Regions:
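Short glycine/serine- and small hydrophobic-enriched flexible loop segments
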Residues: 56-62, 182-190, 460
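Conserved catalytic-core segment of NTP-binding enzymes
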Residues: 74-147, 265-266, 287, 291-300
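General small-molecule cofactor/ligand-binding pocket signal
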Residues: 148-152, 240, 250, 397
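Nucleotide phosphate-binding/pyrophosphate-handling subdomain across enzymes
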Residues: 68-71, 81-92, 96-97, 162-310
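Beta-strand-loop-alpha "switch" segments that mediate conformational coupling across diverse proteins
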Residues: 153-159, 317
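ATP-dependent carboxylate-amine ligase catalytic core
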Residues: 2-86, 102-106, 132-135
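Short catalytic-loop micro-motif centered on adjacent basic/acidic residues
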Residues: 44-45, 125-128, 250-251, 285-287
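ATP-dependent carboxylate-amine ligase
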Residues: 86-87, 244-248, 255-468
């Protein structure tokens, strides 16, 4: 799977656990040296990062003699380097969203065409409820590639006559993921000749059922192992809650409009479920970053209704200086470029709040908090300085790295984080006034969302054991 959150070993798992450091090192050098020896002089470059890890993953699975390999596509499907398996047991397409538009296209239909490229002749494929036209594109791709395509039944259909299924992953959107997982698992068990899961009888492509152009796969009787699997599933960085004293961290990597909408629904419900402080003093903080060609304005607009007291923007770097932690390094971007993107996000947040106030005169003005920082050109380092006074600031702050951002948010109240320096790199008055509120609040609720790399950096700082 990809991306990893803390350590690259997370991408290659056996029996649910990342392979050990020794095993990773062993197979890394074995694959690297073999590629080096067989390199074609006409094509001297080694495979890129993701492609190399894909080759390595296949080699690990073959050498370790796994019974089943679950392979997640990197980007799209048709032209992805994972799409070299000629006869998989089954294929699955989860809920579609707009992402990686420069590679996959800027419409759901174009993206659906790319996703459908993983379909194989005679190999059953499943998908979940999709918008009408993208679903039609998937059906057309299935017919083109002679692949029997089925629509997963709703999870509710599995619950008839039994108690409601409990999912380990929170959020309503996880129900469709669970329904897809059940169908994929059933096909594997059916291939193995396991009894008690029912047999999926192939429906001719194009058959309509309940007005749908894609046939609906029937629900089946779930085994105890399936029910337990759904209940015990964990996936770091997705709808994850960490309670550290008065500071509660809500982590959910989401970088498309549909995933941000799901994140907002989950966060609002999760915050409601938490015990309310007796004196009512609660501070809500957003920690956000997005990378690539994503429309951050569209993403941030969806987060405004959460009524955050502060919005914090920072790059995905855990520290300002380059560390020796290769798992967290991205050599394709610089701190300066990343920080410029954060400043753009902050200005967007300011504009969105001002528009919100303009639309509703009863809303309080965002004058009471703010702090816009701009990079000052220096030699060898990056400094942050406050700009000239502006008539209207936003309740937003920009930090140069995650460590500084998290220390400011926690204000020494999270045992995993050191207290912020008395004279830090954030001299704006809003940082000082916000620090007082954060220190005195009975509860601090922090939503960390956007880039999965951001979530991974936060996890590394909040749970050092993940780096071991």
């Amino acid at each position: 799977s990809s991306p990893h959150l803390v350590q690259v070993r997370e991408r290659i798992r056996i029996n649910g656990q990342p392979i050990s450091k020794d095993l990773f090192s062993k197979y890394f050098w074995l694959v690297y040296n073999r590629l080096e020896k067989t390199r074609d002089p006409a094509h001297a470059s080694m495979p890129a990062y993701f492609r190399f890890l894909t080759i390595m993953a296949f080699h690990v699975f073959l050498q370790e003699k796994v019974d089943l390999a679950v392979v997640e596509v990197g980007i799209g499907g048709t032209y992805d380097c994972t799409n070299i398996i000629r006869s998989p047991v089954v294929c699955g397409v989860s809920s579609l969203g707009i992402d990686h538009t420069s590679i996959l296209g800027d419409t759901m239909e174009k993206i659906a065409w790319q996703k459908g490229g993983i379909f194989k002749p005679g190999v059953p494929a499943f998908t979940v409820a999709q918008p009408e036209r993208p679903l039609e594109v998937l059906r057309e791709r299935a017919q083109e590639l002679k692949c029997p395509l089925y629509l997963c039944p709703e999870l509710d259909d599995f619950e008839e006559g039994c108690r409601a299924l409990e999912l380990g992953l929170a959020g309503a959107h996880q129900r469709s993921n669970a329904a897809l997982a059940l169908q994929l698992a059933r096909m594997w068990l059916q291939r193995r000749g396991c009894q008690g899961v029912g047999e999926l009888k192939e429906v001719p492509p194009g058959t309509e059922l309940l007005g749908r152009p894609v046939p609906l796969a029937p629900p089946f009787q779930l085994t105890d192992a399936m029910i337990q699997g759904l209940r015990d599933t964990e996936w770091l960085g997705r709808t994850q809650v960490l309670c550290h004293g008065p500071v509660t961290w809500y982590l959910d990597g989401a970088h498309t409009t549909s995933s941000i909408q799901a994140c907002v629904r989950w966060f609002r419900q999760a915050a409601l479920n938490q015990d309310k402080p007796h004196d009512g003093s609660e501070v809500r903080v957003l920690l956000f970053n997005a990378t690539g060609d994503r429309d951050t304005a569209a993403l941030l607009k969806l987060l405004v209704p959460c009524h955050f007291d502060y919005a914090v923007f920072c790059p995905n770097f855990t520290e300002v200086s380059v560390t020796n932690n290769a798992d967290q390094q991205n050599f394709n971007v610089t701190l300066e470029n990343s920080l410029t993107r954060c400043l753009e996000n902050q200005r967007t947040w300011t504009r969105l709040l001002e528009e919100k106030v303009g639309q509703d005169p009863w809303l309080p003005s965002p004058l009471r908090a703010g702090g816009l920082l701009q990079p000052a050109p220096t030699r060898g380092s990056l400094l942050l300085v406050p700009p000239a006074p502006r008539p209207l600031n936003s309740p937003a702050l920009v930090f140069p790295c995650l460590a500084q951002a998290l220390r400011w948010v926690a204000q020494g109240r999270d045992p995993q984080l050191a207290a912020p320096a008395a004279s830090g790199a954030h001299p704006h008055p809003a940082a000082s006034s916000g620090a007082v509120l954060l220190r005195e609040a009975a509860a601090v609720r922090v939503l960390v969302t956007g880039s999965l790399h951001l979530v991974g950096g936060v996890l590394r700082l909040l749970d050092p054991a993940l780096s071991q």
